[in-house]
C-alpha cells in the first residue's frame, strides 16, 4: 500500500514566515479528560483479497454486507464485501471527472440497502442501491447541493428525510438540506471563546473547526468531534440540549493567511460513531509540529490514532481503549462485542478487536 502524507501541509508551513498572519489560540486552558477504565486491546488482522487500497479510510457493516471507503482509490472509491467472511463482491464509485464519476470522496452513509456518498469538488450527493442479487451497487441518482453548504466534507441523514452538513463558512455550525439538496436552514454556532475573532474571520474558523459528525436517530443524539484541537459537542435534538466538552488540547489553533487558515496546534480526533448506547471517538493527540518534524526526518508518524475513547450519550467519560494499531476509521458492533478498524499504515488494513 502506498502511504500518503500531508506533504502539501508541510509546504504551506514552510512559507508561513513569508506572510504577516493572525494566530488564533484558545483563551483558557482545560484539564485533561480522564477515564475511569483503561484497557489495552490486541487486534486480529483480517486479509482482504482482490483490492488494492491506497488509503482505507472508513467502513460500515450492515447485516451481511460491508462497504469500505478508499479515500484515494486509484480506480474506485468504494468496495462491497460480504460479512463476516469479507469476500469482495463489487467496486463502485469510479474515480474521474465524467458525469457518472466522482472526483473526490469524503463521507458516506450506508444502511444496508442505500448508500449516499459525498463528492466535495462536485458539491453533490450520489445515491446507490444494493442490487436484487445483493452482489453489486447500482448508481441511481446524484443531487446537487445548495451553494450555501460550502465545502461539504461530512454528512449524516437527519430528521424528516433531510441531511445535516457541517457549515465551513463559519456563520453557523450546520446546514440542513432537504432530499433535493436545497437549504432548509442553518443552525448552531461554533462554540469558541474567541467570539470577536470568529466575527472577523468566519471562513477561517469554519475550516479550523472542521468536525467529524454522527447521528443516532433512535436516541436523537448528534455528536461533532473536531479534527484539530480537542472539542466534542453533543446535541440531544429530542430534548433540545447542547453540551460542549473541551480537553487538554482545547480549541483548534490555526494561523490565518490572506485567504487560508493553517492548523498549527494538534490533531485531536479522527473518526466518530454514535451507537444507541455510547459515543466512540478515535483520538490521535499529536501536535502538528511533531508530525512535521518527523516527516522532515524521513520517519513520518503513523496516520490515525491508537486510542478509542468511549463516552456516555450524555458525554460522561466511560472507558479508554489503547490499540496496537494506529487506525483511521472504526465500526463498533456492540451486540457482537467487537470493533472493526482500518489501519492505513499497513498493507493489510482491516483489524478486528474484541471489546472487553
Residue ranges with predicted function:
Residues 282-303, 351-353:
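Short, conserved, GDST-rich strand-edge loop motifs in beta-rich repeat architectures
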Residues 57-60, 106-110, 154-159, 203-218, ...:
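Structural signature of eukaryotic scaffold interfaces centered on beta-propeller domains
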Residues 249-258, 313-333:
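Conserved blade-ending motifs and adjacent loop-strand segments that build the rim/top face
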Residues 45-76, 279-291:
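Beta-strand-rich domains and repeat architectures in extracellular enzymes and scaffolds
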Residues 176-178, 296-314:
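Beta-propeller blade signature
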Residues 41-49, 90-101, 140-148, 184-206, ...:
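Surface-exposed loop and turn segments in beta-propeller and other repeat-based domains
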Residues 123, 130-161, 165-166:
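Asp-box/WD-like beta-propeller blade repeats and closely related beta-sheet repeat scaffolds
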Residues 28-53, 316:
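A short helix->beta-strand "capping" segment at the edge of beta-propeller domains
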Amino acid at each position: 500500500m502506498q502511504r500518503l502524507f500531508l506533504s502539501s501541509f508541510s509546504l504551506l508551513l514552510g512559507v508561513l514566515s513569508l506572510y504577516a498572519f493572525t494566530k488564533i489560540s484558545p483563551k483558557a486552558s482545560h484539564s485533561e479528560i480522564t477515564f475511569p477504565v483503561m484497557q489495552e486491546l490486541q487486534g486480529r488482522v483480517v486479509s482482504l483479497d482482490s483490492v488494492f487500497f491506497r488509503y482505507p479510510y472508513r467502513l460500515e457493516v450492515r447485516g451481511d454486507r460491508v462497504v469500505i471507503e478508499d479515500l484515494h482509490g486509484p480506480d474506485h472509491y468504494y468496495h462491497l464485501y460480504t460479512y463476516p467472511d469479507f469476500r469482495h463482491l463489487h467496486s463502485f464509485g469510479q474515480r474521474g471527472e465524467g458525469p457518472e464519476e466522482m472526483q473526490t470522496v469524503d463521507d458516506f452513509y450506508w444502511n444496508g440497502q442505500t448508500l449516499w456518498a459525498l463528492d466535495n469538488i462536485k458539491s453533490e450527493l450520489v445515491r446507490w442501491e444494493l442490487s436484487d442479487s445483493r452482489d453489486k451497487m447500482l448508481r441511481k441518482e446524484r443531487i446537487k447541493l445548495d451553494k450555501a453548504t460550502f465545502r461539504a466534507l461530512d454528512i449524516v441523514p437527519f430528521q424528516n428525510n433531510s441531511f445535516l452538513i457541517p457549515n465551513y463558512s463559519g456563520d453557523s455550525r450546520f446546514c440542513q438540506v432537504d432530499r433535493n439538496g436545497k437549504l432548509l436552514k442553518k443552525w448552531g454556532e461554533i462554540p469558541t471563546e474567541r467570539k470577536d475573532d470568529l466575527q472577523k474571520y468566519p471562513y477561517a474558523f469554519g475550516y479550523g473547526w472542521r468536525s467529524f459528525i454522527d447521528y443516532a436517530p433512535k436516541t436523537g443524539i448528534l455528536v461533532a468531534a473536531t479534527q484539530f484541537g480537542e472539542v466534542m459537542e453533543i446535541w440531544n435534538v429530542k430534548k433540545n440540549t447542547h453540551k460542549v466538552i473541551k480537553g487538554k488540547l482545547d480549541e483548534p489553533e490555526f494561523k490565518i493567511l490572506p485567504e487560508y487558515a493553517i492548523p498549527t496546534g494538534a490533531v485531536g480526533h479522527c473518526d466518530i460513531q454514535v451507537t444507541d448506547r455510547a459515543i466512540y471517538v478515535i483520538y490521535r493527540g499529536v501536535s502538528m509540529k511533531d508530525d512535521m518534524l518527523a516527516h522532515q526526518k524521513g520517519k513520518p508518524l503513523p496516520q490515525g490514532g491508537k486510542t478509542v475513547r468511549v463516552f456516555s450519550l450524555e458525554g460522561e467519560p466511560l472507558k479508554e481503549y489503547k490499540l496496537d494499531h494506529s487506525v483511521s476509521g472504526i465500526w463498533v458492533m456492540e451486540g457482537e462485542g467487537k470493533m472493526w478498524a482500518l489501519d492505513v499504515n499497513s498493507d493489510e488494513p482491516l483489524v478486528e478487536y474484541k471489546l472487553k
